[in-house]
Amino acid sequence: VATRIKDRQFQRSLCDNVLYPQITRSFIRDNCACQCGKGVDDALNRMNVHLRRYFLKNGSNGWVPKCDIRHYFAETPHTVAKAAIRKRLTDQDAAAYTDMIIDSFGGEVGIGLGSQVSQITELAVLDDLDHFIKERLRIKHYIRYMDDFVLIHNDKDVLQTALKL
């Protein structure tokens, strides 16, 4: 069911004025989806940058798995999505409205595609993963576009460990 015009206007204002500025602050540079100044072209450019840097340091020895989180939007639990938003928002009214929007998708699992709120929510859900890969696992060459990501590393075991998480 399509969102009504007045609801779409409210969601757009909520995203542009509250959610986007607060939530994207913690995003890594190489999270390339649904953000001002980023997109598919940026993701491709960042991929080229990472491949060049890796190649200059390591040559062609290494691994580059391209990964997709299967059924990402359809299988995101609402509790996880709401927690990811609340963790990053200071405005509790905006958090409550966002919770209602997430719950409007019905059931306890699944975030609808296409909504601006859905996109920013799903980016926030994987923000902790981005930081874990970059900071804890120290995988320097990592690029993500929504639920697709690429890791570049010389140690296959390190990558297999990362992919099991």
Task: Go through each PLM region and give its residues.
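Short acidic (Asp/Glu) patches
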Residues: 37-52
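Short secondary-structure capping/junction motifs at helix and strand boundaries
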Residues: 21-30, 56-60
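Conserved polymerase palm-domain catalytic core
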Residues: 48-146, 150-165
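A generic secondary-structure signal for well-formed alpha-helical elements
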Residues: 17-26, 85-93
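Short glycine-rich, polar/acidic loop-and-turn segments at beta strand-coil junctions
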Residues: 5-6, 16, 69
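Short, conserved non-catalytic motifs in the polymerase core
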Residues: 1-11, 26-39, 101-123
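Short helix/loop capping segments that flank catalytic or ligand/cofactor-binding pockets
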Residues: 10, 23, 74-77
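Active/ligand-binding-proximal structured segments within catalytic/core domains
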Residues: 10, 14-18
